[in-house]
C-alpha cells in the first residue's frame, strides 16, 4: 500500500534571517557568495512539495513506522521521522513515537518559543512526546530570502540538487553501523543538542530531496539525480523515487548502497560462501518516505 502522493504550494511571509541556536559549534554553513554580493532585496522563495511513502512489506497494514509532516508556515517546513523497529521486541509499537513526534512538531512549528529554529522545534517536539520508543529525525525550515535551516538526528537524510548536481548532503549520525543516533523516551539517548545543524543558501529552481533511510540505503545518488532531472513534477519524482527504493529493497541481488557500506564495515557472508564466490548483496527492506521540494518564487 502506497500513501497517495500529495502536492502543495507553500506561501510566503515576512523574511527573517535570525538563527539563535543554543549549540552553535555544531552548525555548518554553506554559502555560495560573499556577504558583499548578497542583494538586500530579492524575490521571496517558497516550496512546491511532493510526498510519497511506501511501508515495509510486512508493515503495510499499520502503514509502516515512518512519519512526516509538511507545513506552509513561513517559507515552508518539512520533516521526516523514522521509528526504531527494535522496540517491537518489547511489545512497543515503533510507529507511535515517530507519529507523535511529527504531530507535535507540526503543532509547535509556529510556537513563539521555537523562533523558527530547527533545534528548538526538535527539542520542544521531543519533550512533548510521551509515547515509548525512539526515532531518527530530519527537519528543514526555509527562510523566504533563500536560507534553508536543517536539523538532523540519525540517518534520515537531505540532498540539495542544483542544475543536475548534488551540491549539499547531510551526513548520517551513527554510534556504529546500522545503529543511528535517535531521539527516545529513554533518558540515555540523544537530544537536540546532539543534532547536526546546517545552514544552506538555496535559489529558485533548486530541488530538495528528503527521506528516511529506506530511500538512501537503497537508491544511489546518480539514480536520485536522474529521476529528479527527468521528472520535474515534484509529485511524480517523489513517487518514482519511493518506488525505485522499494523495488531495490526487495531485490536480493542488487548491489545497494546499504550492502556496499556493510561490506566496507566488515559485514559479509560466511567464509564458506565466500569460497563459492558469494558476497553480501541485496537492498534493505524498510519503510520508504520521500519528500521532494522545488524552490520557487512566491
Curated annotation (Swiss-Prot):
Q: Which Gene3D superfamilies match?
A: PPM-type phosphatase domain (3.60.40.10)
GO molecular function list: metal ion binding; protein serine/threonine phosphatase activity
The Gene Ontology biological process annotation of the record reads: cellular response to light stimulus; peptidyl-threonine dephosphorylation; thylakoid membrane organization
Q: Where is the PPM-type phosphatase domain?
A: 48-295
EC number of this enzyme: 3.1.3.16
Catalysed transformations (reactions): O-phospho-L-seryl-[protein] + H2O = L-seryl-[protein] + phosphate; O-phospho-L-threonyl-[protein] + H2O = L-threonyl-[protein] + phosphate
SMART domains, A to Z? PP2C_SIG, PP2Cc
Q: Fetch the PANTHER family from UniProt.
A: PROTEIN PHOSPHATASE 2C, PROTEIN PHOSPHATASE 2C 26-RELATED
Protein family per UniProt: Belongs to the PP2C family.
Q: What is this protein called?
A: Probable protein phosphatase 2C 26
| Protein source organism | Arabidopsis thaliana
Taxonomy of origin reads: Eukaryota, Viridiplantae, Streptophyta, Embryophyta, Tracheophyta
Amino acid at each position: 500500500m502506497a500513501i497517495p502522493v500529495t502536492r502543495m504550494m507553500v506561501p510566503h511571509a515576512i523574511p527573517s534571517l535570525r538563527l539563535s541556536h543554543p549549540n552553535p559549534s555544531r552548525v555548518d554553513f554553506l554559502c555560495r557568495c560573499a556577504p558583499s554580493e548578497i542583494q538586500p532585496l530579492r524575490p521571496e522563495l517558497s516550496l512546491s512539495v511532493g510526498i510519497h511513502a511506501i511501508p515495509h512489506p510486512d508493515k503495510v497494514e499499520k502503514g509502516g513506522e515512518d512519519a512526516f509532516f509538511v507545513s506552509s508556515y513561513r517559507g515552508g517546513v518539512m520533516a521526516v521521522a523514522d521509528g526504531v523497529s527494535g522496540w517491537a521486541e518489547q511489545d512497543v509499537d515503533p510507529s507511535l513515537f515517530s507519529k507523535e513526534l511529527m504531530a507535535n512538531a507540526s503543532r509547535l512549528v509556529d510556537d513563539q518559543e521555537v523562533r523558527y529554529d530547527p533545534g528548538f522545534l526538535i527539542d520542544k517536539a521531543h519533550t512533548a512526546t510521551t509515547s515509548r520508543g525512539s526515532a531518527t529525525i530530519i527537519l528543514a525550515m526555509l527562510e523566504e530570502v533563500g536560507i534553508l535551516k536543517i536539523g538532523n538526528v540519525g540517518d534520515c537524510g537531505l540532498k540539495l540538487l542544483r542544475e543536475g548536481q548534488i551540491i549539499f548532503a547531510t551526513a548520517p549520525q551513527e554510534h556504529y553501523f546500522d545503529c543511528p543516533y535517535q531521539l527516545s523516551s529513554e533518558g540515555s539517548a540523544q537530544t537536540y543538542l546532539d543534532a547536526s545543524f546546517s545552514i544552506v543558501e538555496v535559489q529558485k529552481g533548486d530541488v530538495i530531496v528528503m527521506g528516511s533511510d529506506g530511500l538512501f540505503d537503497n537508491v544511489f545518488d546518480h539514480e536520485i539525480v536522474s529521476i529528479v532531472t527527468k521528472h520535474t513534477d515534484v509529485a511524480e519524482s517523489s513517487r518514482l523515487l519511493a518506488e525505485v527504493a522499494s523495488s531495490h529493497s526487495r531485490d536480493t541481488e542488487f548491489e545497494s548502497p546499504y550492502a556496499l557500506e556493510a561490506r566496507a564495515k566488515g559485514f559479509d557472508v560466511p567464509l564458506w560462501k565466500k569460497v563459492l564466490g558469494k558476497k553480501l548483496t541485496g537492498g534493505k527492506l524498510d519503510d520508504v518516505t520521500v519528500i521532494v521540494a522545488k524552490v520557487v518564487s512566491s
